[in-house]
């Protein structure tokens, strides 16, 4: 799968009931993030933090869905540990992909994987540690793949969503380390003539291809 392709649709059992992914997204943005195995340390911190900052995603009209090859029953049992140690229990649906169907569909596991998921170790599922950001058009906007030893930075995911939502509305790009409210770059596809109409106040241009303007509102 690549950025710009349609996110594969699926129907699955989650901790909040059965869902069809595209219908569940509706007109919102969405994050599908997977983890190698329940009852593991790094994942415990990740799912707890995601629950803590869920309101920030909701402000941006972003829905959250987790996934692993464990059962929904295991997810529910693990949620108690997450709340106890992290202060927040998962407050978003988590897919029970015990038949590996979705992990295979998204290319996180080889097509020939089979067997009892309970017998698989976290190392067996090391490739099931991804983040997908999906737009209202059901297209994949971002793919992040992390190693098992490195917890994900969900604040960075928020920053990227801010950039994606801004640049989907305005013909701009965001520069290195950009944060909301900072200057942006006029997209290269916008001619100087069109830029003058859009930005009558002008822009800074240390080079002709680098046209800097305040963030559009």
Enumerate the predicted regions with their spans.
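Chalcogenol-based redox active-site neighborhoods
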Residues: 1-217
């Amino acid at each position: 799968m690549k950025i710009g392709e349609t996110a594969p649709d699926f129907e699955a059992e989650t901790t909040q009931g059965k869902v069809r992914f595209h219908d569940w997204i509706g007109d919102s943005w969405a994050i599908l993030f997977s983890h190698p195995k329940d009852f593991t340390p790094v994942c415990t911190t990740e799912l707890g933090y995601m629950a803590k900052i869920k309101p920030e995603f909701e402000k941006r009209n972003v829905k959250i869905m987790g996934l692993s090859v464990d059962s929904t029953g295991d997810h529910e049992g693990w949620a108690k540990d997450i709340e106890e140690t992290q202060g927040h229990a998962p407050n978003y649906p988590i897919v029970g992909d015990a038949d590996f169907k979705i992990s295979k569909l998204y290319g996180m596991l080889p097509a020939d994987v089979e067997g009892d998921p309970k017998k698989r170790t976290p190392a067996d599922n090391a490739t099931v540690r991804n983040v997908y950001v999906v737009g209202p058009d059901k297209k994949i906007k971002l793919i992040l793949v992390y190693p098992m030893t490195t917890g994900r930075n969900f604040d960075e995911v928020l920053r990227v969503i801010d950039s994606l939502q801004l640049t989907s509305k305005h013909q701009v790009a965001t520069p290195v380390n950009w944060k909301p409210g900072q200057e942006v770059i006029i997209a290269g596809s916008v001619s100087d003539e069109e830029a003058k109409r859009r930005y009558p106040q002008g822009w800074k241009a240390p080079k002709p291809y680098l046209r800097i303007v305040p963030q559009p509102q």
